[in-house]
Amino acid sequence: MEFVTALADLRAEASCPICLDYLKDPVTISCGHNFCLSCIIMSWKDLHDSFPCPFCHFCCPERKFISNPQLGSLTEIAKQLQIRSKKRKRQEEKHVCKKHNQVLTFFCQKDLELLCPRCSLSTDHQHHCVWPIKKAASYHRKKLEEYNAPWKERVELIEKVITMQTRKSLELKKKMESPSVTRLECSCTISAHFNLRLPGSSDSSASGS
């Protein structure tokens, strides 16, 4: 409640008494009150001799106002705080039971459903495993990590194999591009790389005999 009150006071301080919106290009007049530059210009548009304050009716002797950049910065802060306050309120509303208007603090393991204290004691979940949200979150996070662990290991293994094969292919390419390597040596190197037997090799001849 203190935050809400402080935010309301800040908004009042950062609002223009004429348009009742946040101050735009705030200026201060002789009596000390602040207005949007465009609002005070329009308010004094047809005046010539005296210029009354639209808020306190003090008669300013001349059409004079001073730019107030500090108040402009304060206005921007007030805007951001209000936006955050609205977001926080929406988030809090999402975590409140629509039926009992109580905060959702439990989790039903069977129905996979968030519950408020009253829902957790209802007959709908009477014989179900109901845990506090923090305990349920920790449990399911651990289960998810255990499920992902084997897949993570497989991915790492595949990456290692790909890296090794890429390195071997580069080595083979360099060897084949070397001018001192004969065609037979190239064939033998390729066969060894892919674990193949060359036609006409001793094993092939032996099997044919």
Swiss-Prot record:
Identification of the protein by name: Putative tripartite motif-containing protein 61
- Check the record and name the Pfam families matching this protein: zf-B_box, zf-C3HC4_4
Positions of B box-type zinc fingers:
92-133
UniProt key word Zinc:
yes
List the record's Gene Ontology CC terms alphabetically. cytoplasm
Zinc finger annotations (RING-type) as residue ranges: 16-57
One GO BP annotation here? Answer: regulation of gene expression
Q: Which UniProt keywords apply?
A: Metal-binding, Zinc, Zinc-finger
Name any one GO molecular function.
Answer: zinc ion binding
Q: Which residues bind Zn(2+)?
A: C97, H100, C119, H125
Tell me where on the tree of life, at the top rank, the source sits.
Eukaryota
- CDD domains, per this entry? RING-HC_TRIM60-like_C-IV
